[in-house]
A protein has these predicted regions:
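ATP-dependent helicase/translocase motor core
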Residues: 2-336, 345, 349-361, 386-389, ...
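Conserved helicase motor
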Residues: 139, 344, 366-377, 393-399
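Conserved motor-coupling elements within RecA-like helicase/translocase cores
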Residues: 372-390, 402-406
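Interdomain helical connector at the RecA1-RecA2 junction of SF1/SF2 helicase-like NTPases
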Residues: 450-547
Length: 547
């Protein structure tokens, strides 16, 4: 059977139809049809080129008009630079920084003056339709040792290959797309993945998205476009959910992180619920700003940014980072985010998340340049300066005076329901009277939890345990009444214990005797006896080995 009439091609055609008819991407079939040269359809000179140079120059000149050709050429050369000493993930990180933040170039302007570090933007993130979206099928790429590979679909934006899609027929395991194709392509044509933002795998029934560093189990489904949607695992849902032009650019610009906390670069892409939840929280801020300017809500109402309830284990700390970094990137004004926790381990864990992805420096608590408050005095000093991020325990608010009237401070309270009713929480609000508050929690609020609602407002995003289990992010916990049961083998045990107590406690007064009887009556020594614990351990091992 030829490729044109294969089952793989049928699902590929379905996917490309979605790109063209529903998403408005340009599409092209390159299989046995591509020419080469400046005047060719894609403008490639040979199969080794993975950046579409012709489109790249068209868009970068459009977005950065009036510059000498040397400036555009330098931008292209910088984006094409290669390194033989860096890993694929490190190269991908460097390319991402250039593509997202712009490419710095030096040139002589029309007045003959030297211009240094002029940043040329590659994408128009504010108006998606100003960009060139092109999905190309079956494009031959030549890589190591002149070996060639032909990916199913490559998605180019302004000539940059940001999207890689590998498709399989419905009867084939999706994991094969990862093991047999994706990993092979990374090895043979790594240059394609220098620029890659997203990897999509699908067999028409299962569909997953991941990054170039992700293992297969870290690829996740994209089942919803809005939080209210019922989750559907389908090819059209993941393509529409991820590749709609505005969502695609938003996901690229604001929902990619690179974590270097373990000594090697790991690329992280927001999961479906994080993308939806963070955007809902940010839309709520924008909505309240508009209402406040129109005089429809009070300042107190504007300061209540809502409760972000995403169940434990759903990546809440990373959601905080996405939330903060999108506001820093898209909002005007120098915001300070104050992350407040009530436990040392949470404080350390959240700071570790922020520092691991480069949002804050990796410095020890107590160091001169630390952004973690080590005392109430240190906290006052930190709040007196304009930092992007600060971290503290609620207990450091051991003072009552006002520190600043700044209205561009957002307090992020982790496990918001636990510590909002006491004196320390009151001190926090007195110190920052114009701050806004958002609560992050992994625990649902009780209906009568009026204190938390009074401070933060209602839910702004909800991702509960059941939905997390359905999405494969959490494992259900079942209780099976099994194991080592307690039973009475000696019917006269009570009389024997009484006899021992009577024989050994003649010199005890009534209170001491009562205390001895209470100790013998406790279940703990029986429940934790070595013989019983050994039996429980053996049963647990048997259960997990045979389930």
């Amino acid at each position: 059977m030829t490729w044109e009439y294969s089952e793989d091609n049928l699902i590929e055609q379905t996917a490309i139809d979605l790109f063209f008819h529903q998403l408005g991407w340009d599409t092209l079939l390159a299989y046995n049809k591509e020419g080469f040269g400046d005047g060719s359809t894609l403008g490639r000179l040979n199969k080794k080129e993975v950046v579409l140079k012709k489109i790249f120059f068209e868009k970068i000149k459009e977005f950065n008009p009036g510059l000498p050709q040397k400036a555009y050429q330098e931008a292209y050369e910088k984006i094409m630079e290669e390194s033989i000493t860096k890993s694929l993930a490190e190269i991908n990180f460097e390319k991402y920084q250039l593509l997202r933040n712009g490419i710095p170039v030096d040139f002589i302007d029309e007045k003959g003056e030297q211009v240094k570090n002029k940043t040329l933007k590659v994408f128009d993130f504010d108006n998606a339709e100003n960009n060139n979206f092109l999905a190309v099928r079956q494009l031959w790429i030549q890589g190591k040792s002149n070996r060639e590979r032909r990916p199913d679909i490559i998605g180019f934006v302004n000539g940059i290959p940001l999207l890689f899609i590998e498709l399989k027929a419905a009867h084939r395991k999706l994991e094969n797309a990862y093991n047999d194709n994706f990993t092979d392509y990374k090895d043979v044509i790594p240059k394609l993945f220098h620029y890659n933002a997203f990897v999509l795998l699908s067999n028409g029934i299962e569909s997953r998205i991941g990054s170039i560093t992700g293992k297969y189990q870290h690829f996740h489904e994209w089942k919803r476009i809005t939080e209210e949607d019922e989750g559907i695992v389908a090819l059209d849902r993941i393509i529409l959910g991820v590749c709609e032009k505005n969502r695609f650019l938003d996901l690229f610009e604001n929902f990619i992180l690179f974590d270097n906390s373990l000594g090697k670069v790991v690329k992280l892409i927001a999961r479906n619920h994080q993308f939806i939840g963070v955007n809902k929280a940010i839309e709520n801020i924008q909505h309240k700003e508009q209402l406040y300017k129109l005089g429809k809500i009070t300042l107190e109402e504007k300061q209540k940014l809502g409760v972000f309830w995403h169940t434990q284990g759903s990546g809440k700390s990373y959601s905080m980072v996405f939330f903060c970094q999108k506001i820093h990137h898209k909002f005007t004004g120098s915001y300070t985010f104050l992350v407040v926790t009530d436990r040392n381990e949470l404080d350390t864990q959240i700071y570790g998340t922020f520092s691991g992805v480069g949002a804050v420096p990796q410095v020890k608590a107590g160091a001169k340049d630390s952004l973690k408050a080590s005392s109430g005095k240190h906290l006052r000093e930190l709040l007196g300066s304009e930092h992007r991020y600060l971290f503290t325990l609620i207990h450091k608010f051991n003072f009552e005076e006002e520190i600043t009237k700044r209205n561009n401070i957002i307090v992020i309270s982790d496990e918001a329901h636990r510590t909002q009713g006491g004196q320390l929480a009151m001190n926090l609000r007195n110190a920052l009277p114009n701050a806004s508050f958002i609560g992050f929690t992994g625990t649902p609020l009780f209906k009568d939890d009026e204190i938390t609602k009074r401070i933060f407002g209602d839910y702004v995003s909800r991702y509960d345990f059941k939905r997390s289990v359905d999405d494969g992010g959490s494992v259900p916990l079942y209780n099976e009444n099994r194991g080592e049961y307690l039973g009475l083998k000696n019917p006269i045990i009570n009389e024997q214990i009484r006899a021992v107590i009577d024989a050994e406690s003649e010199d005890l007064d009534s209170d001491q005797r009562s205390r001895v009887e209470q100790l013998f009556a406790r279940e703990y020594p029986i429940l934790t006896s070595k013989k019983r614990l050994d039996a429980i351990a053996k049963d647990a091992v048997w259960h997990f080995c045979n389930r």
